């Protein structure tokens, strides 16, 4: 059976699996999706909608039409950018800034 904490994607005819906990963020580059992990970058053909369908409600935040981040690897949050634990700085688009702020406020209250 499929594991709830895995991300599945196709490379050629093969189905690949990564643990969600290992994924720093997803980046959309045209018709390709880049999966950034500590081990490096894996690329597959797909859409961000396909990514959202698998990671929704599992600790990932949409911060931009081209970026979905694993909240566990966000080290610094600013109004218009996040910095990941690996030092990568990613933009937060205007569309998602209010949502990000409310998510972080909620986390801060719970913490």
Feature names for model-found ranges:
Residues 1-6, 103-111:
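Inter-domain helical "communication" segments and dimerization helices
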Residues 1-85, 89:
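Conserved binding/recognition cores within well-folded domains
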Residues 80-106:
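C-terminal structural segments of small proteins and small subunits
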């Amino acid at each position: 059976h499929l594991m709830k904490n895995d991300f599945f994607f196709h490379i050629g005819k093969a189905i690949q699996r990564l643990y969600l906990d290992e994924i720093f963020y997803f980046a959309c580059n045209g018709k390709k999706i880049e999966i950034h992990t500590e081990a490096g970058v894996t690329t597959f053909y797909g859409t961000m909608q396909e990514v959202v369908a698998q990671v929704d409600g599992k600790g990932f935040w949409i911060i931009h039409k081209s970026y979905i981040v694993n909240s566990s690897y966000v080290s610094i949050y600013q109004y218009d950018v996040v910095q990941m634990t690996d030092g990568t700085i990613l933009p937060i688009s205007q569309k998602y800034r209010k949502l990000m702020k409310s998510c972080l406020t909620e986390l801060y209250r719970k913490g």
